């Protein structure tokens, strides 16, 4: 896109220069006063000075155009930088997240290794097999529950007895 603007600006400047040059030629031809013989219009030095002047004007205009383009590009860069909130900080955040993820991954690997060691120790200890030497152990193993907030076996027994008593009272009070 920048090259398109550059080419368009160059064409505009060339067209403007040729338009100004043609106007100057028209004005010189239409002058009502003939040039005296001592006037150096036909002199090659005068032609080269005019040529250098027009080249200098073109170069000056072109330099001004390039300066304005650089200024526009710089402003655009500043706006993009502000929108992106400084790319260096973004890279730093990504690096920190990567480091934190690596740390988390290392901790997870360590904990998995520890869990595997504990499981192997549990299997070696004999907890993996169910040896029921006494019936007390069977009842105790079957009644054991998670610590997830569920009622214990005793609480269920109490609730069952309360429900049974309420049901019997209801039967006695209702006439069938």
Curated annotation (Swiss-Prot):
Induction: Glucagon release is stimulated by hypoglycemia and inhibited by hyperglycemia, insulin, and somatostatin. GLP-1 and GLP-2 are induced in response to nutrient ingestion. Residues 84-89, 131-145 form a propeptide. Pfam families: Hormone_2. Keywords: Amidation, Cleavage on pair of basic residues, Hormone, Phosphoprotein, Secreted, Signal. Glucagon is secreted in the A cells of the islets of Langerhans. GLP-1, GLP-2, oxyntomodulin and glicentin are secreted from enteroendocrine cells throughout the gastrointestinal tract. GLP-1 and GLP-2 are also secreted in selected neurons in the brain. Residues 1-20 form the signal peptide. The modification Phosphoserine is found at residues 54, 105, 108, 150, 152. Residues 25-59 are annotated as: Disordered. The modification Arginine amide is found at residue 127. It is found in: Secreted. GO terms for cellular component: extracellular space. GO terms for biological process: adenylate cyclase-modulating G protein-coupled receptor signaling pathway; glucose homeostasis; negative regulation of apoptotic process; positive regulation of insulin secretion involved in cellular response to glucose stimulus; protein kinase A signaling; regulation of insulin secretion; response to activity. Proglucagon is post-translationally processed in a tissue-specific manner in pancreatic A cells and intestinal L cells. In pancreatic A cells, the major bioactive hormone is glucagon cleaved by PCSK2/PC2. In the intestinal L cells PCSK1/PC1 liberates GLP-1, GLP-2, glicentin and oxyntomodulin. GLP-1 is further N-terminally truncated by post-translational processing in the intestinal L cells resulting in GLP-1(7-37) GLP-1-(7-36)amide. The C-terminal amidation is neither important for the metabolism of GLP-1 nor for its effects on the endocrine pancreas. The record marks 52-53, 83-84, 91-92, 97-98, 130-131, 145-146 as: Cleavage. One of its GO terms (molecular function) is glucagon receptor binding. Residues 25-35 have a biased composition (Polar residues). Belongs to the glucagon family. GLP-2 does not have cleavage on a pair of basic residues at C-terminus as in other mammals. This is Pro-glucagon. It comes from Ovis aries (Sheep).
